[in-house]
């Protein structure tokens, strides 16, 4: 008998590193009739957090859930009260015309919370596994058939600290690296829900292979003035990290090194670092 119930199951994954989103995002596929295939993403991206608790806050505002830009893609169903019957388009139009009403695709949401202030987020790129997939079959990332398929498509047999692996060909790496650097630096906001829209502009980018130098380069300092302590944001270029400061940063932090091409320079530096790594001869 067919059960009339819906339930959430595991998202389908091809476990195929020839797809760039799979290669960079990783995968996990667990089936009851076979082994579990799992690849961890070489990218670790933290949540945004306040530079200092005193430099951020939570506010209340009214927002609208707006779907009025494409009414044909977001139809509104209208039913008679106490009935499951849907009104036809002609009946809806007649009602609106007779009663001088409109049928909005906006939902008014009151007392919504939003955060404001100075925030930071960390991104770690594991170059050892960025373009390498393991061929280990004890904790497999790939099926044996997929391993042979990758070899036929030019993937290079190599070895890294985690064991034997296959490396994406250089021409493909050279295509992905600029796109990855661009995506990490030039992220986009696609939501239109906030009535008090903020660009959330990037003020500074710090790049280093030393994790300790990153939080030291973009930080805050607590100034205790008795009853009213304050936090001062600081951009420090002497911590060992390469710091790229944008023009808007000068409005919030005292600096003399802001540059109109800061984000372009940061993107180019990421490209240089990723291209300089020897993916094929790690050992």
Residue map of PLM features:
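RNA-binding basic/glycine-rich loop and surface signature characteristic of RAMP-family CRISPR effectors
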Residues: 1-283
